[in-house]
From Swiss-Prot:
The lineage of its organism: Bacteria, Pseudomonadati, Pseudomonadota, Alphaproteobacteria, Hyphomicrobiales. It catalyses: thymidine + phosphate = 2-deoxy-alpha-D-ribose 1-phosphate + thymine. Keywords: Glycosyltransferase, Transferase. It is an enzyme of class 2 (transferase). One of its GO terms (cellular component) is cytosol. InterPro entries: Glycosyl_Trfase_fam3, Glycosyl_Trfase_fam3_N_dom, Glycosyl_Trfase_fam3_N_dom_sf, Nuc_phospho_transferase, PYNP-like_C_sf, PYNP_C, Pyrmidine_PPase_CS, Thym_Pase_Put. It comes from Rhodopseudomonas palustris (strain BisB5). This is Putative thymidine phosphorylase. Belongs to the thymidine/pyrimidine-nucleoside phosphorylase family. Type 2 subfamily. One of its GO terms (molecular function) is 1,4-alpha-oligoglucan phosphorylase activity.
């Protein structure tokens, strides 16, 4: 870098209380002597340097001296945390050189197949925030056109290697994953304590919701801490045989979260990208046995058996290459599983099943038992075919509930507000008849409109499922919100399209709950 391009004089770091998501943002005053119009422009990429430490950031220019003085450089919260230098430190600023790995992205755009070294370079730069969202999008779109099996294997390996790689002494480390898309469906929080109660190791890391009303981490956070670091996670697993934590805090496949944040707005979800995302995290987690749940249904991610078969073979191919035994089960994805949709409501359902309460959702209980049965079959001390009976025994006896409480105590108490939303409205059946369809995507959107998952107590409580008979005006589900304006938005959305079909009628009336 030409020395004349460095900021002269150096600027001093100032921390700005500005959440810019995953983006590193640096703010400079328009009156700064370091600002050169021919070099620095708003939204350009810059390199911040202190000795040998370098951070890439997006530059923004302000006219507000109260925000940033002429001799200061403001760092957004993410940038300040990643740079990890104290306020007042002298920092130089220069235009950022484009990452060399962009040559590989250009080659991929032109239809070339990338080498493992090229893919590793791209993923390393993505994980270290050297790519803009536009550059990430270019890579993802070019890969969506065609990804060879060799490229897929290299992508999984690179994504797993760039972050934390967990290693366990146990020869059998079981794991479970659902590809998502079904409201509720909080089986993981029931399967983990059942499997751990059997004595199998199941260190479960889960994601937060991106487009759904709750992820497993969001729901578990109602009951316990989920933001454990690697050493804390290992202590919990050593004590309990399992855990239920947020994967983002232990840095498993960090590039995946960055790629997903760009994929979702573009509606990019190819089989190869899905497999790379899931398998990189399982490889990084040290899993040796993996059960994957494929819900199949008209509004699920997989709509047909043929789609499920192709995706299953892709998962098995990658698993075989990396020494992970992959088992795929297809399940009913026509409707939500359980009654609650949203963190607090889903946590209620989970604890009702674990506590063997008479009003516990039967579908959530049964699906959890069947999934747990598959994992228990990996226990060499259990007779073949005895998995389901043993899972049921562990649940019915209270052993699974006891194990869940041990995990909760080991992870630490929740600091979240676990109260149900104080504002509610019932969505009413549009006609007499039978519920003959539920749009999972629509129900998810309605629960998010009500405030979930950011507001833990927001969401939807289902009263009816497919096949249930209803009378006109009878409540079919209740919307909860913590803010009246969010409830009003959800009511308007439900009146336009409730997500329920009764005798092929979907418009519904909505009645506030006093």
């Amino acid at each position: 870098m030409n020395a004349s391009h460095l900021s002269r004089p150096p600027l001093t770091i100032r921390r700005i209380s500005l959440d810019t998501g995953r983006e590193n943002v640096a703010v400079i005053s328009r009156r700064s002597r370091a600002l050169r119009a021919d070099v620095f422009r708003g939204f350009s990429r810059v390199a911040l340097r202190i000795n040998t430490k370098v951070l890439l950031a997006t530059l923004m220019i302000t006219d507000d001296d109260a925000m940033i003085g002429p001799d200061e450089l403001g760092l957004s919260e993410p940038a300040f945390r990643r740079f990890n230098e104290p306020v007042g430190s002298a920092v130089s600023v220069s235009p950022a050189q484009p990452p060399a790995s962009l040559d590989a992205v250009r080659a991929k755009i032109q239809g070339h197949t990338l080498t493992p070294a090229e893919i590793t370079a791209v993923i390393d730069d993505v994980a270290h925030f050297r790519y803009s969202d536009m550059e990430i999008a270019a890579f993802l779109i070019s890969a969506a056109r065609f990804t060879s099996t060799d490229e897929l294997l290299a992508l999984v390996d690179a994504m797993a290697s760039v972050g934390t790689r967990l290693k366990w002494q146990n020869p059998i480390v079981v794991d479970k994953h659902c590809i998502g898309g079904i409201p509720g469906n909080r089986t993981t929080m029931i399967v983990v304590p059942i499997v751990a109660a059997q004595g199998l190791m199941i260190p479960k890391t889960s994601s937060r919701a991106i487009t759904s009303p709750a992820g497993t981490a969001d729901t578990m956070e109602v009951l316990a801490r989920v933001d454990l670091d690697v050493e804390q996670m290992k202590r919990v697993v050593t004590t309990c045989g399992g855990c239920l934590i947020w994967g983002g805090h232990v840095n498993l496949s960090p590039a995946d979260d960055i790629l997903i944040s760009v994929e979702r707005p573009l509606s990019l979800d190819t089989p190869e990208q899905m497999v790379a995302s899931i398998m990189s995290k399982k490889l990084a987690a040290g899993s040796t046995r993996l059960l994957i749940d494929f819900p199949v249904g008209p509004s699920a991610k997989i709509a047909s058996a043929s789609e499920a078969m192709r995706l299953r073979k892709l998962f098995e191919f990658v698993g075989d290459h990396f020494g992970i035994a992959v088992e795929v089960v297809t399940t009913d994805g026509r409707q939500p599983i359980g009654r609650g949709i949203g963190p607090v409501l889903e946590a209620r359902d989970v604890m009702a099943v674990l506590g063997n309460e008479p009003n516990a959702p039967a579908d959530l209980r049964e699906k959890s038992l069947r999934l747990a049965a598959h994992l228990l079959e990996y226990d060499p001390l259990l007779r073949g075919g005895a998995g389901y009976a043993r899972a049921k025994e562990l649940l019915d006896s209270g052993a699974a509930l006891k194990k869940m409480q041990q995990i909760i105590d080991a992870q630490g108490p929740s600091v979240c507000n676990s109260e149900l939303g104080s504002h509610a409205a019932d969505v009413l059946a549009p006609a007499d008849g039978v519920v003959n369809g539920i749009d999972c995507l629509r129900i998810n959107r309605l629960a998010r409109t009500a405030g979930a998952p950011i507001v833990k107590g927001a969401g939807i409580d289902l009263f009816k499922k497919i096949g249930d008979r209803v009378d006109q005006g009878e409540p079919i589900y209740r919307i909860y919100a913590s803010d009246r304006s969010e409830l009003d938005l959800a009511i308007a959305a439900a009146e336009a399209e409730s997500g329920f079909s009764v005798n092929h009628h979907s418009p519904a009336a909505v009645e506030p709950v006093s």
